[in-house]
């Protein structure tokens, strides 16, 4: 069966318009900026501007980590872009999502609020399969709902597996991609301990990530 990409959706540091994001990347614009300036070591990250209220009611946000919020928003934008038929068989719609670590913000909040009442939805909020599950619930997809956790390759693997599923005739519509939301102090400190995050001089955060430069020093979270 022929496979085609019919819609795109992004929530990125360069906005949620795919064309504008691509143009910004082609111009070499950096979205990396300083974060958590109170930490012992300077850190830079690329943050996506995001208004959760655009996609969720206050009640719906209960137990939904930012990583799942981003996934739902991007999936909705992709479905809108595709003009997906409203009468599609739910059992023929699959969700294939990449997520390397899951809901870091939920776990961080639980740790920092250990002496207070623990939110009862903390566990499902930080599970790596939460983004796929929330996308499936939002789109009422009843086909395969799968999560791929393969470090930085997670989203790429998810998209490839989705294409295979369509090609094999397992689904008619595959919502595929990935999300991550790791810019919280605990995760930043953990990556710093591995000495993998890029260093930068004061005022030079935007130039921190230069993977092909001889003086490269690491990457930035986003």
Regions found by a protein language model. Give the residues of each.
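ACP-dependent fatty acid/polyketide chain-elongation machinery
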Residues: 1-60
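Generic anion/oxyanion-binding catalytic loop in active/binding sites
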Residues: 10, 64, 148
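Acyl-thioester C-C bond-transforming condensing/cleaving domain
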Residues: 16, 27-31, 80-91, 97, ...
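A glycine- and small-residue-enriched flexible loop/hinge segment at structural boundaries
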Residues: 35-85, 128-142
């Amino acid at each position: 069966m022929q496979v085609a990409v019919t819609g795109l959706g992004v929530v990125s540091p360069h906005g949620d318009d795919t064309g504008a994001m691509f143009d910004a990347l082609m111009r070499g614009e950096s979205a990396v900026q300083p974060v958590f300036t109170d930490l012992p070591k300077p850190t830079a990250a690329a943050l996506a501007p995001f208004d959760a209220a655009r996609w969720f009611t206050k009640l719906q946000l209960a137990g939904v980590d930012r990583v799942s919020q981003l996934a739902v928003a991007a999936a909705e934008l992709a479905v809108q872009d595709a003009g997906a038929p409203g009468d599609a068989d739910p059992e023929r719609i699959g969700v294939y999502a990449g997520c390397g670590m899951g809901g870091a913000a939920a776990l961080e909040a639980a740790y920092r609020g250990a002496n207070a009442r623990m939110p009862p939805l903390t566990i499902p909020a930080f599970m790596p399969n939460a983004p796929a599950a929330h996308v499936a619930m939002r789109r009422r997809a009843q086909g395969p709902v799968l999560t791929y956790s393969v470090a930085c390759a997670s989203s790429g693997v998810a998209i490839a597996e989705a294409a295979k599923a369509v090609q094999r005739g397992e689904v008619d519509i595959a919502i595929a991609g990935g999300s991550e939301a790791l810019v919280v102090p605990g995760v930043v400190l953990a990556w710093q301990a591995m000495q993998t995050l890029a260093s930068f001089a004061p005022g030079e955060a935007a130039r921190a990530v230069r993977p092909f430069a001889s003086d490269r020093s690491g990457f930035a979270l986003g």
